[in-house]
């Protein structure tokens, strides 16, 4: 009896509810344990003045249904945030509430699901970054993750600078003189805006500036700069901008020294390839050893080469020559 009573005591002493299993998708969707705890604290029980109209049998299960709806709202917010990671939290919350409206019919369940969406709103990214910096051990050298983030930020900034770079085009006017038109693509908030600056006339008194966010060009202001340039200076600038490297630099957005280095390296590679084709590999050379005097003498004595080619053999099967009897012939 003692052997049977010991396992029974162990079973009674063990907790009735099993330990909750860890969500395998928590690294991707985020931790929802805090939100679920808030749901359990938010719905401790139903007030006695609001019974369910369906019947008294469903009132004990109403608490579990609301808690389940709230926890499902936490999970829906995490899924919406994982699908649209770049969107704002307000947009993700709106999508979560719409999903709760589609999932539940009753107003209380929809409200509980929406409360789960509100409880799963993540902390601001600045606080998360501060926590990560606090958890990182102090070190004198930068880690690989910091170097990678710095490289990505540099690439993004260079790409944005390339998009917002200035492109210059030359147009032909009635007086046969080229007048530059400058177009600048810049970001204003979250919208891409184009600014066009036109230089009118050979001796301009005004610069026309146009801005085109999404509609036709609209003149916004007229500036009057004071230009004091001489004819020789203008001609020298035209000569500097008329070469090949300046033209390619304006069209590609790359600096002139990068284009010059690429051109110089390409010429060196072409010369190297042309020199490599003239030199053969060492294995293709035929090495002839010089002959000694005895080898030359042996070749001259032992050589039985015919001086003239032999005659072809006579054809034995040829018919004999035809003989005529002259005494039988009469003249």
Curated annotation (Swiss-Prot):
GO biological process: branching involved in ureteric bud morphogenesis
Record: glycosylation sites: 90
Keywords associated with the record: Glycoprotein, Golgi apparatus, Membrane, Signal, Transmembrane, Transmembrane helix
Function: Modulates the O-glycosylation and complex N-glycosylation steps occurring during the Golgi maturation of APP. Inhibits APP transport to the cell surface and further shedding.
Pfam family, one: BSMAP
Leader sequence segment: 1-21
Alphabetized PANTHER family for the sequence: TRANSMEMBRANE PROTEIN 59-LIKE, TRANSMEMBRANE PROTEIN 59-LIKE PROTEIN
Superkingdom, taxonomy of origin: Eukaryota
Protein name stated in the entry: Transmembrane protein 59-like
TM segment ranges: 258-278
């Amino acid at each position: 009896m003692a052997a049977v009573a010991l396992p029974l005591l162990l079973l009674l002493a063990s907790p009735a509810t099993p330990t909750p299993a860890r969500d395998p998708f928590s690294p991707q969707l985020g931790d929802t344990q805090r939100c679920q705890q808030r749901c359990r604290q938010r719905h401790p029980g139903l007030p006695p003045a609001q019974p369910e109209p369906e019947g008294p049998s469903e009132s004990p299960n109403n608490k579990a249904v609301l808690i389940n709806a709230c926890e499902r709202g936490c999970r829906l917010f995490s899924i919406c945030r994982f699908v649209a990671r770049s969107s704002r939290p307000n947009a993700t919350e709106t999508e979560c509430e719409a999903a709760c409206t589609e999932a539940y019919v009753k107003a209380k369940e929809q409200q509980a699901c929406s409360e789960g969406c509100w409880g799963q709103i993540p902390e601001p990214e600045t606080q998360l970054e501060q926590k990560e910096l606090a958890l990182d051990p102090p070190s004198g050298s930068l880690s690989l993750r910091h170097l990678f983030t710095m490289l990505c930020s540099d690439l993004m900034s260079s790409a944005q600078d390339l998009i917002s770079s200035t492109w210059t085009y030359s147009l032909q006017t009635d007086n046969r003189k080229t007048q530059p038109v400058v177009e600048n693509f810049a970001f204003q908030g979250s919208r891409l805006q184009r600014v066009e600056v036109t230089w009118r006339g050979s001796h301009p008194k005004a610069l026309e500036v146009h801005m085109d966010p999404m509609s036709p060009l609209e003149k916004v202001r007229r500036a009057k700069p004071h230009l004091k340039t001489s004819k020789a200076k203008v001609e020298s600038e035209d000569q500097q901008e008329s070469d090949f490297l300046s033209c390619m630099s304006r069209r590609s957005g790359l600096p002139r020294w990068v284009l010059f280095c690429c051109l110089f390296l390409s010429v060196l590679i072409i010369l190297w390839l042309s020199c490599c084709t003239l030199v053969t590999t060492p294995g293709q050379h035929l090495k002839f050893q010089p002959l000694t005097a005895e080898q030359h003498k042996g070749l001259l004595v032992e050589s039985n080469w015919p001086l003239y080619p032999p005659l072809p053999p006579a054809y034995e099967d040829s018919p004999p020559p035809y003989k005529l009897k002259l005494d039988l012939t009469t003249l």
